[in-house]
A protein has these predicted regions:
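Class I (Rossmann-like) S-adenosyl-L-methionine-dependent methyltransferase catalytic domain
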Residues: 2-41, 52-55, 68-103, 107-117, ...
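Class I SAM-dependent methyltransferase "Motif I" SAM/SAH-binding loop
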Residues: 46-51, 129
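Short beta->alpha connector loops
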Residues: 50-52, 135-136
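Gly/Ala-rich phosphate-binding loop of Rossmann-like dinucleotide-binding domains
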Residues: 60-61
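Conserved acetyl-CoA-binding loop of GNAT-fold acetyltransferases
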Residues: 64
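A short SAM/SAH-binding and catalytic strip from SAM-dependent methyltransferases
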Residues: 110-113, 121-137
């Protein structure tokens, strides 16, 4: 996160256990489509803004080395405790590094990450980390990713996108305008899968439903593709 206010709100949500965004199971699109990447066992997968996602357990079980980054020490602590793992801990620059088996989590601010902190990265797994950020920060998030991750690493990007007003179904099921605006200059964008759902327009009960699109993108750097 880039502002102290955003950081404070995120840390406060974990202190207050306001974490409805945390999923209690592995993302079904991950389990369904990951094998199509043909990524070699032992490859290193970066999971930005990882929270305490169970997807990291799944990835490690498939034989991958997982490197997460998470601002909240409560989230990191809970991840290891709830999965009955006893991590080793040490300082790494501005971060606290927690490690157990194939899973490493850097506890600290994503925007403080340097390439040397991550080491070699073969794939990025973004499970709605991008879309969880405030809109004015997303471009900074993408730009920083390009600095700390090598061009050779593809991005497995999961998003939840609201259908825009006056948008046709064919437009809604295509590459989102924001995704195109953020990535098209430097990446080839492959929209691999789309699922539509109707969800409450707000957290207030008895609200109208709105259509949202759950999308899976595979992003490949143009510098590698060429």
């Amino acid at each position: 996160m880039t502002s102290s206010r955003d950081n404070h709100l995120w840390l406060q949500s974990w202190r207050d256990q306001q974490t409805d965004f945390h999923q209690q199971s592995v993302n079904p699109l991950l389990a369904r489509f990951w094998s199509g990447l043909k990524l070699a066992r032992g490859s290193r997968v970066f999971v930005p803004l990882c929270g305490k996602s169970l997807d990291m357990i799944w990835l490690a079980a498939q034989g991958f080395h997982v490197i997460g980054v998470e601002l909240s020490p409560i989230a990191v602590r809970d991840f290891f405790q709830e999965n009955h793992l006893k991590p080793a801990k040490r300082r790494l620059g501005k971060f606290s590094l927690w490690q157990h088996g194939r899973i490493s989590i850097l506890c600290g601010d994503y925007f403080s990450l340097k390439k040397k902190d991550l080491g070699i990265i073969d794939m990025v797994y973004d499970r709605a980390a991008l879309t969880a950020l405030p809109e004015d920060i997303r471009r900074l998030y993408v730009a920083h990713m390009q600095v700390i991750v090598p061009d050779s690493a593809e991005v497995f990007l999961l998003t939840m996108e609201d259908a825009e007003e006056n948008e046709s179904l064919s437009q809604a099921l295509g590459v989102g305008k924001e995704i195109s605006g953020l990535y098209a200059e430097n990446y080839l964008i492959d929209l691999t899968h789309v699922e539509s759902a109707f969800e409450p327009a707000s957290e207030v009960h008895n609200q109208d439903l709105q259509r949202v699109e759950y999308k899976l993108y595979r992003l490949c750097s143009k510098s590698v593709a060429s």
